[in-house]
Amino acid sequence: MNDNELDNYIEAGRIAKTVLHKCAAEIKPGVGLAEIFEMVLDEISAAGVSHSFPPNISLNNCAAHDTASPDEERIFAEGDLVKLDIGTHIDGYIADTAVTVDLGDHASLCEASRAALDAAINVVAPEVVVSEIGAVVEETITSFGYKPIINLTGHALGRYSLHHGLSIPNTGKFGSAVLREDMVIAIEPFASTGSGLVHEAARAEIYQVIGNAPVRSPAGRKIMKKAEEMHGLPFARRWLNVPRAELALPALLRQGNLFLYHCLSDVPESFVSQFEHTIIVTADGALVTTR
C-alpha cells in the first residue's frame, strides 16, 4: 500500500467516524428515519468525500440492509434498537463503520457486540486465520448470554469494492483464509437475543450493479447510468428520480444487471446489536481507521 492509498483510507475513516457519531446522537424517539438518512448524506458531502453505500438504518430484529424508502415515514420509538451503518470513500478507498443506538433497555446486548469488536481487533495481525477472529467474537458474545449471528460476516475492502473476497466470520466454526499485511478489513460482530441466524425479509431498498446485459427500456438505461455513477457501489431506490422505475427495476434484476439486497432479520420480537470498524492489517497488528 502506497502513502496516497494509506492517507485516503485514514482520512475516509476519520470522516466516517465523525459523521457516524454526530448522526447517531440525533437518533431519538420521535425523529424520522429519513431525517437521519439525509443527515448522514449531507454530512458526508459537507466533508468533501463520497458515500460508499446508502446509510443502513436497521431496527430491532433487522440486523442489516434496511434503509429509507422513497416514501419513508417510519419514526423512531421508545424501546427501539437502531443500527446505523455508514460508509465513506475517497477515490474509492473505503471506510465502513457502524454503531447501535439503544432507545430502550438493551445496554448489555450493545456491550456484547462492542466488546466483541474490541476483542477481535486485538487479534488482528498478519498470518492470523480468520476463524481465530470469529472464535473471539463468538466467545465474547456468548459470555454475555447472547448469540452471534453466524450467517453474517465482516469482509475485506478493496478500491470501490465493499466485499472484496475475504469474509471475517462471527464464529470460530469456519473460515480458513489468512490475513496478510496491507489487507483492509471491516469487522462487524452482531449479537442477538434470537436464533443467531438471519433470513431475507420482504423489505428491500438497496441495489447494486452486477451485470451489463443490453437494456432496451429508456427507464432501465437511466437507472443503469445512475448506478454506474456509483462506480459499482450499492445505491438506494430512494435516489432514483426515474419515471417508470418500478417497472424497470424488476426487469434489470431478471436480466442479471442488478442485485437486490433484502433486509436481513432474526426471528420476530428479537433484538440485534452491531458495532463495526475498518482496519488495516499492519506489520505490528491493526490500524483502525474509524476509531
Regions found by a protein language model. Give the residues of each.
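Active-site neighborhoods and metal-handling regions in enzymes and metal-associated proteins
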Residues: M1-R291
